[in-house]
């Protein structure tokens, strides 16, 4: 979004929208699997936890981004307003997901006095899977985002060629 505002190149707007689309998909999967995990671990699918609430609010903020984009007809105006929204939304997401949960009591590890995943907290059998997931999921997200971006570019070029 910053690159779009600096250059006005439509490719950067397309990358921003596909990053948001990919992020929302991962948000929904994260919320759904988190609810399953919470139900097993804490006995209810949605305990009043700052990290869960922050994740839901973050998802809603990016859904609002999509609503905003779809409400505007003119392409340049849509891209500019969406870029500004995206730039302001990102730091709020960081606060919602990382800063506030650390400052308040939470059921999640590392929050409100709960221990983090330290040497004694995670079994050695779980560590390889955990670290592989920490590397793999962002790589999968980047790959999906780049695929969606390339498809969007091809669709745009096809529209330019067709009368």
PLM feature segments, named:
Residues 1-163:
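Polytopic transmembrane helical bundles with strong interfacial aromatic enrichment
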């Amino acid at each position: 979004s910053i690159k779009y505002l600096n250059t006005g190149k439509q490719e950067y707007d397309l990358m921003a929208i596909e990053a948001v689309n990919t992020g929302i998909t991962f948000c929904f999967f994260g919320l759904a699997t988190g609810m399953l995990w919470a139900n097993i671990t804490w006995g209810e699918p949605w305990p009043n936890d700052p990290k869960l609430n922050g994740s839901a609010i973050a998802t809603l903020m990016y859904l609002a981004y999509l609503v905003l984009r779809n409400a505007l007809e003119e392409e340049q105006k849509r891209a500019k307003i969406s870029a500004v929204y995206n730039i302001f939304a990102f730091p709020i997401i960081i606060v919602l997901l990382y800063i506030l949960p650390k400052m308040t009591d939470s059921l999640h590890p590392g929050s409100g006095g709960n221990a983090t995943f330290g040497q004694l907290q995670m079994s050695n059998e779980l560590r390889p899977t955990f670290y592989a997931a920490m590397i793999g999921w962002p790589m999968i997200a980047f790959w999906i985002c780049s695929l969606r971006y390339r498809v969007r570019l091809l669709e745009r070029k096809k529209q330019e060629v067709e009368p």
